[in-house]
């Protein structure tokens, strides 16, 4: 067994295999701790009175929505809003590893990703708009999603391919004058 250190990582060689130390850097652990604390001490207690939403009396739904919106406001105040988006869009500017930590903690309650505004499909659609959207699309749609005032969706499932794998999508659009012609077949919409 040989232990080596490279760029702050510990790499151990055992019996012909390489082992990487996946211990989190202190700054990553600090983010995870903040999110875990928020989930355990803010989100869970706020949601507890409502039980499971499918069993919630209709008379409580308004209070439930108010509680969710207040949780979002608190997430913004505590700097836990939009973990996946750049700071210029009001986000935390986290990378993939840090986002995975946030999502792992947020998923410990059914509303966690929504409270932090990093829920599907919005999280992926925000990235798509950020990287490939026009300035007009960013202004109209991305800012709305980042503010938490809008939701997004997409139609992906096609009968010709197995499931909902976006790499196998066959539907395409062709511009015809001022209009677009969509060629393909979607289902489960």
Name each model feature, range by range.
Residues 7-120, 131, 136-151:
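Amphipathic, small/basic residue-rich leader segments at the start of a protein or domain
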Residues 42, 61, 98-101, 112, ...:
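Generic alpha-helical propensity signal that fires on short helical segments
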Residues 92, 132, 136-189:
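Glycine-rich, Trp-frequent "lid" loop and neighboring beta-strands that shape
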Residues 121-127:
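Well-ordered alpha-helical segments within folded domains of soluble proteins
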């Amino acid at each position: 067994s040989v232990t080596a250190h490279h760029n702050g990582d510990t790499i151990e060689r055992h019996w012909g295999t390489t082992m990487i130390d996946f211990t989190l850097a202190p700054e990553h652990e600090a983010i995870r701790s903040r999110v875990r604390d928020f989930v355990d001490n803010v989100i869970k207690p706020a949601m507890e009175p409502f039980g499971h939403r499918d069993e919630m009396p209709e008379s409580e739904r308004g209070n439930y929505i108010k509680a969710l919106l207040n949780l979002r406001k608190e997430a913004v105040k505590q700097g836990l809003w939009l973990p996946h988006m750049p700071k210029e869009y009001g986000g935390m500017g986290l990378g993939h590893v840090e986002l995975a930590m946030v999502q792992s903690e947020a998923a410990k309650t059914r509303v966690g990703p929504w409270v932090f505004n990093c829920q599907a499909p919005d999280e992926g659609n925000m990235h798509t708009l950020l990287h490939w959207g026009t300035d007009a699309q960013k202004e109209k749609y991305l800012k709305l999603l980042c503010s938490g005032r809008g939701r997004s969706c997409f139609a992906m499932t096609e009968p010709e391919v197995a499931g909902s794998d976006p790499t196998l999508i066959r539907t395409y659009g062709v511009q015809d004058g001022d209009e677009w012609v969509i060629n393909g077949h979607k289902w489960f919409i």
